Each structure stands twice: as structure tokens, then as C-alpha cells.
Amino acid sequence: MKIINFTIPEKIGKSIHIKEDKLPYFYPHLHRHVEIQITWVLSGEGTIVIGNNMKPFQPGDLFVIGANQPHLFKSNPCYFEPDSRKKIHALNIFFNPEGFISQLLRFPEMYNIKKFIKSSNYGIQASEKDAPKLFEHFLKVINNEEGFMMAYFIEMLQTMANLTEWKYFSTESFEYLFTDIEGLKMNDILRYTMDHYKEEI
């Protein structure tokens, strides 16, 4: 098993991609993609793996996952039971930092946003205090079209860049691509850890 290179479906004429997940459980494989991912968990519990760290997630959490950063939302075991009626619900915004926004980042006024995008390589989570502020911006982005969507998207990034209480996941920035061998090793470690996390080491 290796890290799956996931391709986010692109819509012609769209610079950012909005995706709503309503499923029995989250996508159960460690994967990565070239887009930065902003995820708002509306319902569902489990363990999130970003880079070289993991922690529980719950409804109300908001994460920013860097481009090409291996990650996994692992739903709790009860979601996989045959008679389970549990569902997950999440809203996602994807954008390629090497795409349209790379042109905008050349402007000096975009310095803080550029710095924030760089920090996403560590995998970050909004604090409980700041998350509600971001939800309002999130909804503006996904509920608008064309120019208004882009304006609200930049506004959201600026708001994120101004926050100071982000929780960092990784101790190292994941700016490089893993080889298949490295991905295999990481999957083995994660699989063992998550299968035996209740046991004493």
C-alpha cells in the first residue's frame, strides 16, 4: 500500500473547487494532491493524520492541509460497522497554489496571504475561538459565484492570515513529494499505530 496521488476533479472556468462530502465515512486511504485543502467538519468523528502527526477530530473543526501533504481523515470504527447509520458531512475548498493565486501573490499587498499559504505546508487547524469567525467566510465563498466567490475567497485567506492561534500538526514542512517507498513505510507505521493505539508500548 502506498500514498495515493489523488486528482481533484476540475471544473472548466473555475480557479477553486468546492466539494461537499455526505458519506457513511471519510475517504479511508492516506492520500495527497497538488491542491491546498480547507476542510470544515460538520459531522463525523475520528482521527486525522497530517504529515507526521495525528489527533482526534470532531464536528466544528476546520483544517488547512498543504499541497502534496499526505493526509487521512480516519473515521471511528463504529462508522464501518455493517448496521451503522452514522454519516459524515464536510465542506471542502481546494485550490492550487501554483495556479491563479500564484499571480496574485506577486503583489506586495498579498505578503501576509503568501506567508499563510506557506505555513499550510505544516498542516494547521483553527483554534476553537477562531473557527466560528472562519465559518462565516467559508459560507460566503461556497454560496457565491464567479467574481463574488473570488472576492470572498481572498477575504477569507486574509482573515486566516491575520489569525495568530493556529495549531500546527507537523514539525517539518512537507514541500517535497514522497517516493512510493517512503509512502509504504508511512502507511505501515500509521496502520500499526491506529490498529494498536489502545495497547501499551
Regions found by a protein language model. Name each.
Residues 56-74, 153-160:
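Conserved long hydrophobic alpha-helices within structured protein cores
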Residues 14, 109, 130-137, 149-152, ...:
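Alpha-helical structural motif
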Residues 3-8, 69-136:
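A hydrophobic/aromatic-rich effector-binding and dimerization subdomain
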Residues 1-63:
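Generic protein-terminus/edge-of-domain signal
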